[in-house]
Amino acid sequence: MRLIPLVTAEQVGKWAARHIVNRINAFKPTADRPFVLGLPTGGTPLTAYKALVEMHKAGQVSFKHVVTFNMDEYVGLPKEHPESYHSFMHRNFFDHVDIPAENINLLNGNAPDIDAECRRYEEKIRSYGKIHLFMGGVGNDGHIAFNEPASSLASRTRIKTLTHDTRVANSRFFDGDVDLVPKYALTVGVGTLLDAEEVMILVLGHQKALALQAAVEGNVNHMWTITCLQLHPKAVIVCDEPSTMELKVKTLKYFNELEAENIKGL
């Protein structure tokens, strides 16, 4: 596992965006051989999306031959709702780059048959072989996507009940009213995530410090979903300074020295 310890949220976003752009450009995607990118929502990736849009407008990357799969979507929230993840992605990323509409894949939280929708999503991912890079965030309790504590590490795309803590955390997007936050969501599974060629998780803020500590210094534990990254052959965590407050000094020193060349220029 790689840990990229940075100082600010803006630096985390810029590093993540630069990494994505480098991966896409090195892959040299075509219409017949697209680069497959997994994407998250929420507050954490906003700086990364902003940086990606800026790099696209500067001519440094094209998304014309990129296929995307989003991590999750609320159940029962109309896709036109401003807080649906469909709306979020278009508002913050898709509408500002050259990705074709047919290359965008989002779960349908209003599908008449939820189980069939989850199977369809998994089959669509498999039809491309694999996701080349899956970017994600992490919750205070270590959840990735909506794989809450005690999620199976072999799980696939499915419906999940959101914990009260997750709904409280997300209520900031619903005028602070937890009752407006949906109780259920569709989410890729931990197994789906681990199938990706590379997984990159962004960690911001002191509230995520215990989750980061579990991921880097703890044991694999289904109560901390983020620890699944220890099972992945190519996982990278990009974090800001406040999120590292629970890490041992020697752990942070080790990764700072190891990644010194990769941190330059931010």
From Swiss-Prot:
<feature type="site" description="Part of the allosteric site">
    <location>
        <position position="158"/>
    </location>
</feature>
<comment type="similarity">
    <text>Belongs to the glucosamine/galactosamine-6-phosphate isomerase family. NagB subfamily.</text>
</comment>
<keyword id="KW-0378">Hydrolase</keyword>
<feature type="active site" description="For ring-opening step">
    <location>
        <position position="148"/>
    </location>
</feature>
<feature type="site" description="Part of the allosteric site">
    <location>
        <position position="151"/>
    </location>
</feature>
<dbReference type="GO" id="GO:0042802">
    <property type="term" value="F:identical protein binding"/>
</dbReference>
<dbReference type="InterPro" id="IPR037171">
    <property type="entry name" value="NagB/RpiA_transferase-like"/>
</dbReference>
<dbReference type="InterPro" id="IPR004547">
    <property type="entry name" value="Glucosamine6P_isomerase"/>
</dbReference>
<feature type="active site" description="For ring-opening step">
    <location>
        <position position="141"/>
    </location>
</feature>
<dbReference type="GO" id="GO:0019262">
    <property type="term" value="P:N-acetylneuraminate catabolic process"/>
</dbReference>
<dbReference type="InterPro" id="IPR018321">
    <property type="entry name" value="Glucosamine6P_isomerase_CS"/>
</dbReference>
<dbReference type="GO" id="GO:0005975">
    <property type="term" value="P:carbohydrate metabolic process"/>
</dbReference>
<dbReference type="GO" id="GO:0004342">
    <property type="term" value="F:glucosamine-6-phosphate deaminase activity"/>
</dbReference>
<feature type="site" description="Part of the allosteric site">
    <location>
        <position position="254"/>
    </location>
</feature>
<dbReference type="Pfam" id="PF01182">
    <property type="entry name" value="Glucosamine_iso"/>
</dbReference>
<feature type="site" description="Part of the allosteric site">
    <location>
        <position position="161"/>
    </location>
</feature>
<protein>
    <recommendedName>
        <fullName>Glucosamine-6-phosphate deaminase</fullName>
        <ecNumber>3.5.99.6</ecNumber>
    </recommendedName>
</protein>
<feature type="active site" description="Proton acceptor; for ring-opening step">
    <location>
        <position position="143"/>
    </location>
</feature>
<dbReference type="InterPro" id="IPR006148">
    <property type="entry name" value="Glc/Gal-6P_isomerase"/>
</dbReference>
<comment type="subunit">
    <text>Homohexamer.</text>
</comment>
<dbReference type="GO" id="GO:0006043">
    <property type="term" value="P:glucosamine catabolic process"/>
</dbReference>
<keyword id="KW-0119">Carbohydrate metabolism</keyword>
<comment type="pathway">
    <text>Amino-sugar metabolism; N-acetylneuraminate degradation; D-fructose 6-phosphate from N-acetylneuraminate: step 5/5.</text>
</comment>
<feature type="active site" description="Proton acceptor; for enolization step">
    <location>
        <position position="72"/>
    </location>
</feature>
<comment type="function">
    <text>Catalyzes the reversible isomerization-deamination of glucosamine 6-phosphate (GlcN6P) to form fructose 6-phosphate (Fru6P) and ammonium ion.</text>
</comment>
<feature type="site" description="Part of the allosteric site">
    <location>
        <position position="160"/>
    </location>
</feature>
<dbReference type="GO" id="GO:0005737">
    <property type="term" value="C:cytoplasm"/>
</dbReference>
<keyword id="KW-0021">Allosteric enzyme</keyword>
<dbReference type="GO" id="GO:0006046">
    <property type="term" value="P:N-acetylglucosamine catabolic process"/>
</dbReference>
